[in-house]
Amino acid sequence: MRSDFAEFRELVALPGESFNPIEAAFLIAMDEYPKLSAARCGRLMAEMKNEAEEHMRSLQGRSAKRAKGPEVIAQVEHFNKLFFETWGFHGNNDEYYDPRNSFLNDVIDRRTGIPISLTLLYVDIARGGAAIEVIPVGMPGHFLAGFNAREDLYIDVFGQGAFLTLPECAKRAESIIPELIFEPGHMYRVGPRVIVARMLRNLINIYINEENFPKALHS
């Protein structure tokens, strides 16, 4: 990255909770799309969060609020209807290695992406708009959303919001990496800086596989 590099570096240098992975992801996209403005990026997120809040209010008959226990699952199911059915977000199985799957503006415009970009978007809107306490979770070969309060259930955003138990995650991981001997420790909460670093690595690997070395170096 060169364009917007100074702003990106300043953002990465921010301490702890001040670092915003959504903002960083949009800066990565702005490097690819110089005409993409920060104002448009912010507007896109604000509009979706507002719609998510209204959606939860209309379904629950009250303002969106933080839920606990079984009510969280019901809230996730309600939010999933908006995210996957109304908005039409889905995993891009057909063009998994298309670089556009890693640019957040493209993910929003095209309604498709890869596990990490879809989950980043899902978690941010769920937390900021639908008031659902979900977190990003890494596992071997895949990326999920999970819950702060429990480690036995996960959300496969790439898989249209399907709930996965820990044994199902183990089966999925071992199907992706046959030599893997799965352990519960393979499921881990992913910090915001790690998410952005993984998104950049994905782009670099895609460009290397395409033998687009100038792009790989630029990223």
Protein language model regions, located:
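A structural boundary/capping signal
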Residues: 1-219
